[in-house]
């Protein structure tokens, strides 16, 4: 069952076409990462899902409802800006959430605040960015939600805390669904079951990480060759090499058949895949 | 949820209240006017004579001078950050992704109306209590009228400033707009055809003091305008993007 379904979503900011007719499906119980460079449209897509932004076109369905407001009590969202009321202390913030959020477990929030070793009675205004992020995550993870939406949850955290947070998110999967945005590849590799790569307002890949690694290949030529655009994802020119990025066994075979004996196939890791999708055709000699 | 909004308002509410109580105390303590004030007034013999009357002194110096000037300011201080600060600080995301917009809007508006009205009711009744303590000869039957005028005027300003707060993504714009309205409203009163737009004489309870009772037409007009402003605010908030 899909917890999130998006079809043909378009979002403009004035003349800027930020999201260009995207489709997205997030399976129940999975950790689904939206991976993309800054400005790709990840946050805009998520905000449209949650009703914070109003899309100009397209269909959105979250937890079976086309009106996100009806299912807010089952969603826990951590935005890109992890800002909470600065005049409160963590303990008072927990009380605030207890009064405001329907399915909120205050004892779990306090437990997480202690686990992050945050000062319980200091004003949030005095916290560093990392501490504010940890507090926000404590409050968000204490919600008994079915869908957790995290927008760059580990940005600004030190590596130790980042790993703790990733473990916490990992533990959510199974019973809960996680939709997660990031531009940090190792993080996504560590926790995501499925990944959607977004570039310039469009999804250029949806699928499992292993599937991506299995299907994306480099084909390396010693000299520049002419390849049909429908067979390659991107091309990279390097000194002494011309590299084509192809997706799928069929396309790989077709390219090899065009230049028999001249093509050398190489594996790609997630970073290679991401970079080639984000950058598209490039000339590394320039 | 209203409790959360009350917590957010508590400091500025307390500060406003203390300033107003200090103002009330000062006008009682300063009676009769010190010599320098009398010199400033020149020779307004009639005014000085009237000021000797407890009833006139209390109405003119409190409702007609101090409180009436503070009513829009109190409304501005309560209303300007209600929405704009949430947007400016990014806390709006926490609210809107955990509660329907209608609930967020209602709790903010109702808390603002409640705090504003409560403060104005207390500040309208407090002078009556002070007068009773000092055994001044005042007409207590006029106080409900003064209170109604003050609260209705304050509600109108609050609704207007709430709309400014909704329309702004930072806290500076609603303050600037609020100050322009406060000053502009008084200036409009100087032009005869637009005199009705000046809310200050109404809020001062002039008709009540003069013995004409509550100005019901103006009262209902202000209440209808306040409701309209809140409805416009709701549609703007409902469709706003953050």
Region locations from a protein language model:
Chain B
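Aromatic- and glycine-rich beta-strand/loop motifs that create alpha-glucan
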Residues: 1-20
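Transmembrane helix-loop junction
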Residues: 4, 85, 128, 132, ...
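Secretory targeting signals
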Residues: 20-21, 25-28, 48-69, 105-166, ...
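Long, hydrophobic alpha-helical segments
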Residues: 59-85
């Amino acid at each position: 069952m899909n917890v999130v379904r998006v079809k043909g979503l378009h979002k403009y900011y004035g003349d800027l076409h930020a999201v260009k007719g995207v489709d997205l499906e997030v399976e129940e119980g999975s950790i689904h990462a939206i991976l993309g460079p800054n400005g790709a449209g990840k946050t805009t897509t998520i905000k449209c899902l949650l009703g914070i932004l109003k899309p100009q076109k397209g269909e959105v369905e979250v937890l079976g409802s086309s009106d996100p407001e009806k299912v807010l009590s089952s969603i826990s969202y951590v935005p890109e800006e992890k800002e909470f009321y600065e005049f409160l202390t963590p303990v008072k913030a927990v009380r605030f959430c207890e009064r405001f959020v329907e399915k909120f477990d205050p004892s779990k929030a306090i437990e997480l605040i202690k686990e992050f070793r945050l000062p319980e009675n200091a004003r949030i205004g005095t916290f560093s960015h990392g501490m504010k992020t940890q507090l926000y995550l404590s409050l968000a993870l204490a919600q008994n939600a079915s869908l957790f939406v995290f927008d760059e949850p580990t940005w600004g955290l030190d590596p130790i805390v980042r790993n703790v947070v990733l473990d916490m998110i990992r533990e959510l999967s199974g019973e809960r669904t996680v939709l997660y945005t990031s531009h940090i590849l190792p993080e996504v590799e560590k926790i995501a079951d499925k990944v959607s790569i977004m570039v310039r307002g469009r999804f250029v890949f949806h699928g499992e990480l292993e599937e991506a690694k299995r299907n994306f290949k480099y084909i390396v030529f010693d000299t520049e060759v002419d390849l049909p655009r429908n067979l390659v994802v991107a091309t990279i020119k390097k000194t002494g090499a011309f590299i084509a990025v192809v997706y799928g066994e069929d396309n790989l075979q077709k390219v090899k058949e065009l230049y028999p004996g001249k093509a050398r196939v190489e594996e790609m890791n997630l970073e290679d895949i991401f970079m080639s999708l984000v950058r598209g055709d490039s000339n590394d000699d320039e | 949820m209203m409790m959360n909004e009350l917590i957010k308002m508590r400091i500025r509410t307390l500060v406003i209240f203390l300033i107003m109580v200090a103002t009330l105390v000062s006008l009682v303590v300063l009676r009769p006017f010190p010599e320098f004030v009398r010199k400033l007034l020149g020779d307004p013999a009639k005014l000085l004579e009237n000021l000797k009357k407890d009833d006139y002194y209390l109405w003119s110096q409190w409702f007609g001078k101090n409180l009436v000037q503070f009513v829009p300011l109190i409304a501005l201080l309560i209303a300007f950050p209600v929405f704009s600060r949430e947007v400016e600080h990014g806390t709006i995301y926490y609210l809107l992704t955990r509660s329907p917009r209608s609930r967020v809007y209602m709790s903010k508006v109702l808390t603002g109306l409640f705090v504003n009205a409560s403060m104005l009711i207390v500040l309208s009744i407090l002078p009556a209590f002070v007068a009773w303590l000092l055994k001044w000869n005042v007409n207590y039957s006029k106080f409900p009228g003064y209170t109604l005028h003050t609260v209705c005027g304050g509600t109108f300003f609050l609704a207007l400033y709430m709309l400014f707060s909704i329309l702004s993504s930072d806290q500076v714009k609603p303050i600037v707009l609020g100050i322009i309205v406060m000053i502009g409203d008084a200036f409009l009163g100087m032009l005869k055809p637009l005199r009705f737009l000046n809310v200050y004489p109404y809020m001062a309870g002039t008709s009540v003091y003069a013995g004409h009772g509550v100005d019901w037409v103006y009262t209902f007009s202000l209440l209808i305008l306040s409701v309209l402003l809140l409805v416009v605010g709701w549609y703007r908030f409902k469709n706003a993007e953050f």
